[in-house]
Amino acid sequence: EKVMNQLQDFENDCGNWLDNLLSSEMQKAEAAKEIKVHIDQISRLCNENPNIIDDHEIMAHGAMISSLILSHYLEECTKKNFILNSCHFMRLGLDRKPDIKYVKKNVEELMKDCPDVPILITQSRLCKNAYDEVDFFPQIGNEYYATVIGAVFHADEIITSLRSDEICFRGMEHTRTLTYGEAENFIDSGIALLHPECIPLARTVGMAIVLIKTPEDTLRISSEKTGTKVKAAVSRRGVVFVKLRSLGIL
């Protein structure tokens, strides 16, 4: 009963979000109807005995509701868009890493029937696993998921936020650049620039990664080489000096 009450509160919250985002009553009604389908599915799962797979399915319906709200908001802003259910193309292998070959094949088939629209919406981290169960990407950073999505959709570049507080920008340039190799050296030094597996994947498909710290400070990682001057300096705290004394023992 408590869960059902919480679910009703969630449905009411969705209605409030639609009221605040949308001005068209017709658009609100259509969005509410589509959201209701997913809420009913969540209710059905909650009435059964949820196991870990059911829990994933509940979260998947929540992700689709978020996509629907965004889609209807963009429609009202006259921005044509289309929702892609990431479970229809994204899959993890037995090693819990994305099965890139499988994903690319699915994307190619999916895009044949996809409307010609400028904006495609999908769900972050939602996928299927090797056993065809609803699952989620390992929590290793949204930038890695974005890199995988960009790679399989043949994107020229992806844009994500730079969350590390260890990165400080100096100088007048608004956009700084690093090559893939320079970025790897940065990451190897211990700086949390982005997930290490992003770089080799982006390099393989020739895709740039743009990291934004503030609207004025961006960092672009690509194959492009720019200049020979020093681009970055790494300063680490807690350096330990270790003195070794030989005991003369062989």
PLM-predicted stretches and their roles:
Residues 1-2, 6-12, 16-29, 40-51, ...:
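C-terminal catalytic "cap/lid" subdomain
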